[in-house]
């Protein structure tokens, strides 16, 4: 039977519940247990698919096409379990389902209330998401005390009681601030946070205390005394120079032993040698490169969380320190390509909308004409095709219908007809709902033998995840190919362009899919690894 570890946060947000949870999951997995993770988001949006990147950060796409919280990206990077649509749900999703049942008459005229109807639905989804895992870690978003999270906390209180203490425990993350003028860490915020939890019927079993300074044994003993938590279960988690140290830090304090003993699990010891290798490669690089990342959401780098991590993973696999130079594409429009001088490679990620697109196109032109290694992802591929059409083929008005519906040379356009899972044709237009109307999830891609991308993957068919509405216009494809654009990847049925490469260029690859969603620190990703190798070659050439 599945054991549950519920993870909450207190005092302030952004303490790193996702990283701490994923790190504990990684240790339990290293002990031979089957582990899964869930993220429960208290906001009322149905999913984060239509939320602003400046507010929410990245939308992580699962293998089965769910648009989810970026924490699921952390989960997949730390454990081998593949996340699905069942591993993340929101208040909006829960209420939507309950209201749909009410409209159908499933509740037989009952008055619909938060308790029991909403909490029952939350519990049902937790159990479904946990599946047949030995241990399921369930992270509740937000901070204890937020009004939005109350139904979730009540649901886990009920579920904890229903399954019993041998199958459920609560891990609470808090902040232990360091007061410089006093020269000591303060435990009072943690005490009050636990008091808040206990007021709603939740007693934590484990406290993970975050701090930017060491937490001495006397402070941990004081926290244990005032919170009714065993002293061995008060874990000090100081800021680390890489998040991939966290599994080792938690293991060194015996957190996994505490969990295994509490649940009565039979398993072996933790083999963290893979993580030791990751940390060593991360902290002891042999080379260094600088790569320009030209995007439009640079005010909140969490909008590119998986991509930034994927570049770090590529650095790990190549024993290379990857310095990312973050450049807003609008700055290129205003200040020119001088911002790109001296970099070893250029990366253009995905995005939506007209703002900053011309700056991205200019960055592509700079990379192509100056033979600088280039990797384009999603919109980064679409602007590569637009730039090629404008400056090689001579179609100066070439564009995407996303940005200019009147262009005579719309080399990128909206797919207007899709088949749903039943085979029925669904028609979409520019005015269709934004939510849930994209090409989403894992898709097959056929690679052209002898291409750069094939050299990276060393496979004829790959599977990568998508999140987009627009595709290269097949009606104009013959002219693009005739002008030299190389189509090195196509969809499984051969109908859609997935990867393009520029002619007469040392390394220029642009893909419609999002490879960053499948990159991990232990395995890296072949496309990003190849990109960093190309940047290394460029760096050595320029040295």
Curated annotation (Swiss-Prot):
It is an enzyme of class 6 (ligase). CTP binds at residues 13, 146-148, 186-191, 222. GO terms for cellular component: cytosol. The keyword Nucleotide-binding applies. One of its GO terms (molecular function) is identical protein binding. InterPro entries: Class_I_gatase-like (IPR029062), CTP_synthase (IPR004468), CTP_synthase_N (IPR017456), GATASE (IPR017926), GATase1_CTP_Synthase (IPR033828), P-loop_NTPase (IPR027417). Residues 290-541 form the Glutamine amidotransferase type-1 domain. Residues 1-265 are annotated as: Amidoligase domain. UTP binds at residues 13, 186-191, 222. Belongs to the CTP synthase family. Catalyzes the ATP-dependent amination of UTP to CTP with either L-glutamine or ammonia as the source of nitrogen. Regulates intracellular CTP levels through interactions with the four ribonucleotide triphosphates. HAMAP family: PyrG. CTPSs have evolved a hybrid strategy for distinguishing between UTP and CTP. The overlapping regions of the product feedback inhibitory and substrate sites recognize a common feature in both compounds, the triphosphate moiety. To differentiate isosteric substrate and product pyrimidine rings, an additional pocket far from the expected kinase/ligase catalytic site, specifically recognizes the cytosine and ribose portions of the product inhibitor. This is CTP synthase.
